[in-house]
């Protein structure tokens, strides 16, 4: 088949699919994106970059600026696609990520070509992330709801222009309007369960600050891409004094960027990490809390292999790969009892679930795992089994390829 992949940060989530298609050796693989490829591409992939010809117009109503940005990107992507068309390229299937607008007009370039879109999340003013945390978000008024609603025109237009869609989890599918859910398949990107696996003989790890983590120590891990409330950094930091009272020998590793945000609002006073640490100043031993910053993935897995308890907290939002990687490594997990986590973790079966807003509950659950090695082993083994059964990379890729065949052939979405 002739396949066109679209992602502003190519290849993004499509890298494993591209590798599998390359291995089959019978496809023409073309990619379009703005940024340089962020990973080594298979040799058969032709990747073309395009630029933006204009920026946002000054003076626009702030609620439509996001839509204008996406239209600018969509126009640029469609122009690049049209150049490919003029050169004689017509794909059998277009598969792309619509999050930045690029997918809006591709069905106008090739009206008869099926379009499959990777849908991550639909913005809703109520019932999901925006109104979840009353401490950090006052009650939404009509203007807040209107501003959030104006994030959705690109999503709605892309849904209309797509023959079929795919999203990684049932929770993410549930964020979309009900009338569209019947055309959204649930297939996860997949976890490399060979790389993310328990170590038979875990090795000591030396952190950048010189701290040595040794097998058998009471190591607790907590991971955010960026330390922010969306991923429970405030609850975790507030749990530190409780944890150290219960388990003074525990070593807590907090992994992730400490400046800015990936999701949600920026901190109004400095950085979120510093604001919440100031709350517990004088109540904990900082020598046993290690902020590692971002670390390379090949250093991240050995840390998970040493972890005696892994904490994952999130608003009702997109599920992080880091949770599934921790589970794949056999970590005993303390997770928030929020919908995306509850889809993966069942309390006392393959992890422990706690109230997102309760630092004490988090500390007590960690302590339970540190003290009850038999329970921790049982939960960690079950956690890995969950990932092997539902999220193994090879299986997920094969399901993606099968879906692509169905959409390309017109068997679904026609």
In which residue ranges do the predicted regions lie?
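N-terminal subdomain of nucleotide-sugar transferases
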Residues: 1-46, 412
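Acceptor-binding helix/loop patch of EC 2.4 sugar-transfer enzymes
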Residues: 54-64, 113-153, 194-203, 257-270
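Conserved donor-binding/catalytic core segment of Leloir-type glycosyltransferases
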Residues: 208-231, 237-242, 252-255
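Nucleotide-activated donor-binding/catalytic signature segment of Leloir-type glycosyltransferases, i.e.
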Residues: 259-260, 265-294
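Aromatic "clamp/platform" in nucleotide-sugar-dependent glycosyltransferases that forms part
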Residues: 315
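Short hydrophobic beta-strand element within catalytic cores of glycosyltransferases
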Residues: 332-335
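Conserved acidic donor-binding segment of nucleotide-sugar-dependent glycosyltransferases
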Residues: 347-348, 352-359, 368-374
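A short, well-ordered alpha-helix in the C-terminal region of glycosyltransferases
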Residues: 361, 368, 375-390, 396-402
């Amino acid at each position: 088949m002739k396949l066109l992949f679209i992602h502003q940060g190519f290849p993004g989530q499509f890298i494993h699919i591209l590798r599998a298609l390359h291995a089959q050796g019978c496809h023409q693989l073309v990619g379009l994106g703005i940024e340089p490829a962020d990973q080594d591409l298979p040799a058969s992939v032709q990747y073309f970059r395009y630029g933006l010809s204009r920026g946002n117009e000054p003076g626009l109503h702030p609620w439509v600026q996001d839509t204008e940005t996406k239209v600018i990107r969509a126009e640029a992507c469609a122009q690049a696609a049209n150049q490919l068309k003029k050169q004689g390229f017509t794909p059998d299937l277009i598969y792309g990520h619509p999050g930045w607008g690029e997918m809006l007009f591709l069905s106008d370039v090739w009206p008869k070509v099926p379009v499959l879109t990777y849908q991550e999340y639909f913005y809703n003013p109520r019932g999901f992330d925006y109104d979840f945390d009353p401490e950090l978000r006052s009650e939404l008024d009509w203007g807040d709801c209107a501003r959030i609603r104006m994030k959705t025109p690109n999503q709605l237009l892309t849904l209309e222009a797509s023959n079929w869609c795919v999203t990684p989890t049932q929770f993410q599918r549930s964020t979309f309007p009900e009338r569209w859910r019947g055309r959204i398949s649930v297939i996860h990107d997949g976890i490399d369960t060979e790389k993310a696996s328990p170590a038979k003989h875990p090795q000591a790890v030396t952190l950048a600050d010189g701290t040595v983590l040794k097998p058998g120590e009471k190591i607790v891990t907590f991971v955010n891409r960026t330390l922010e409330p969306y991923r429970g950094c405030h609850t975790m930091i507030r749990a530190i004094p409780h944890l150290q009272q219960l388990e003074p020998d525990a070593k807590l590793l907090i992994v992730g960027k400490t400046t800015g945000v990936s999701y949600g609002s920026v901190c109004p006073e400095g950085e979120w990490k510093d604001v919440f640490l100031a709350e517990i100043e004088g109540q904990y031993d900082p020598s046993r809390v290690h902020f590692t910053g971002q670390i390379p993935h090949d250093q991240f897995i050995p840390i998970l292999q040493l972890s005696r308890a892994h904490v994952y907290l999130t608003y009702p939002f997109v599920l992080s790969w880091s949770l599934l990687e921790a589970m794949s490594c056999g970590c005993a997990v303390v997770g928030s009892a929020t919908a995306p986590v509850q889809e993966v973790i069942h309390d006392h079966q393959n992890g422990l679930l706690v109230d997102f807003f309760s630092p004490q509950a988090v500390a007590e659950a960690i302590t339970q795992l540190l003290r009850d090695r038999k329970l921790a082993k049982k939960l960690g083994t079950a956690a890995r089994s969950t990932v092997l059964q539902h999220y193994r990379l090879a299986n997920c890729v094969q399901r993606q390829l099968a879906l692509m065949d169905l959409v390309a052939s017109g068997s679904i979405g026609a």
